[in-house]
Amino acid sequence: MGFVISPKELKSRLDKGDQLVLVDVREEWEYSLAKLEGSILIPLGTLPQSLARLTQDSEIIAICHHGMRSADATNFLLQQGFPNVKNLVGGIDAWSIQVDGAVPRY
C-alpha cells in the first residue's frame, strides 16, 4: 500500500518541512468548514480540468472528508502520470481525531 499516508505520518512529514502539495478534493462548502493549513482546494469533479495546477514532480497528498473521494483522486492522478501521489487515510476527519482536534469535525 504505497499510495496511502496516515494522519500521523503526514503530520511528521509536515513538521520536518517536507515539500508536499496538499490537494483537498472536497466541495467548497466542506473546505470552508475545515481544512489543513496550506492545502489547495480542487473539488474532485473539477480535477480533470485542473491538472495544470499540479506538477508531476511534486509529492501530492489527496485529502477529503473520510478518504474515499481522495482515494479516487489518487487513482486518477496516478493514471494521469503523476507518480508520487498518496491518499490521506481517513481524511480530514481522521486528522481531527488523531492529530489536531482544533480542526472541526462535521
Task: Indicate residue ranges for each PLM-predicted region.
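Rhodanese-like catalytic fold shared by cysteine-dependent sulfurtransferases
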Residues: 1-21, 28-59, 68-106
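Short, surface-exposed ligand- or partner-binding patches at beta-edge/loop junctions that are enriched
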Residues: 63
